[in-house]
From Swiss-Prot:
GO terms for molecular function: catalytic activity. It comes from the Eukaryota. Residues 1-24 are annotated as: Disordered. This is Uncharacterized protein C11D3.03c. Pfam families: DUF1989 (PF09347). InterPro entries: DUF1989. PANTHER family: RE64534P.
Length: 302
């Protein structure tokens, strides 16, 4: 059996060094009343409020899909036929420059997200696009340190594939997302770092990114409350449930049954609150950060 040390090509050492330093606190510590964190009582009420299904959009295996989600709606990403990784992009529907910012979300909450975490938008807006209100996998954490709903990695793309393998291959989440958003006037340049929904990932002892087989079943869901009018795009990853994925120098044919057979559809279910007035009592639409400085730039003196 091949040892991890034989596979590692990393600048990082697996051994820990002790400097007798105190354990560090999180960079963004959840102080009471902080604007960074969701009001759990409010969002629990929203999650449990009566709602009606107003749309269901199926994303076929190895394809992409984009859907407009109105503000104050609830949407669920589901795996109707079993385990399947989902790559998620989100934009403000009216201003695609405001889009999901994986790195800041990771700093504010954690590298893997779950119920009551929020997915934050880019600068200069910096406000929640969605608040997560339901997660059937509930912060799953396994023996190898793998956790679910990942902001560490990003989408698979044809450029890294070509760089590694020398072959052109369109079967990637980046390409799926690009095609999905074109009807909305967006392009490849609008595709951004994703949230890998239902994907279990982590960092090994060499600080290297790893992925595990998707644990989701047909009963699992990832549910969000839309804080703004949104464009939501998903890709049913061509790696399927990641049990037989492979791209690169030693990859198998991506059209082979080994990969195709582990690919399944996704769906987005959109819900409308039946009693919006009572369900949203206390909810305030998020505002952009009112930074009035000028980045240290000064007007020329007269």
């Amino acid at each position: 059996m091949t040892e991890i040390s034989e596979l590692a090509s990393s600048s990082q050492k697996p051994e820990k060094t002790k400097y007798n330093l105190p354990k560090p606190l999180p960079a963004y510590y959840p102080h009471p009343g902080s604007p960074l964190y969701a009001d759990k009582e409010l969002y629990a009420r929203i999650a449990n409020a009566p709602k009606k299904l107003v749309g269901r959009h199926v994303c076929q295996p190895r394809t992409g899909l984009a859907v407009k989600i109105p503000q104050k709606s609830i949407f669920s990403i589901v795996v109707p036929e079993g385990p399947q990784v989902c790559d998620l992009n989100i934009w403000n529907f009216h201003n695609p420059r405001e889009r999901f910012w994986a790195a800041r979300t990771r700093q504010i909450h954690s590298a893997h997200v779950s119920t009551y975490d929020r997915l934050w938008s880019t600068l200069p807006y910096l406000r929640p696009l969605v608040t997560i209100i339901g997660d059937s996998l509930q912060a799953r954490h396994d023996e190898w340190g793998g956790r679910v709903h990942d902001t560490l990695g990003t989408r698979c793309d044809p450029y890294i594939d070509k760089l590694i393998s020398g072959k052109d291959n369109d079967l990637h989440c980046h390409s799926n997302l690009t095609r999905a958003i074109m009807p909305y006037g967006l392009t490849e340049f609008d595709v951004h770092d994703v949230l890998n929904v239902f994907q279990v990932t982590g960092l090994n002892e060499y600080d290297q990114y790893f992925m595990e087989t998707c644990p989701a079943t047909s009963k699992d869901y990832f549910q969000c409350f839309a804080e703004q009018d949104l464009l939501v795009a998903i890709s049913a990853c061509p790696g399927g449930d990641l049990s037989n994925w492979g791209w690169g120098e030693d990859a198998t044919d991506v059209e082979s049954s080994k990969m195709v057979d582990c690919c399944r559809p996704l769906a987005i279910e959109v819900y409308e609150l039946e009693d919006e007035e009572n369900s949203l009592k206390g909810w305030v639409p998020p505002q952009v950060v009112n930074y009035t400085g000028n980045h240290g730039l000064k007007a020329p003196s007269s």
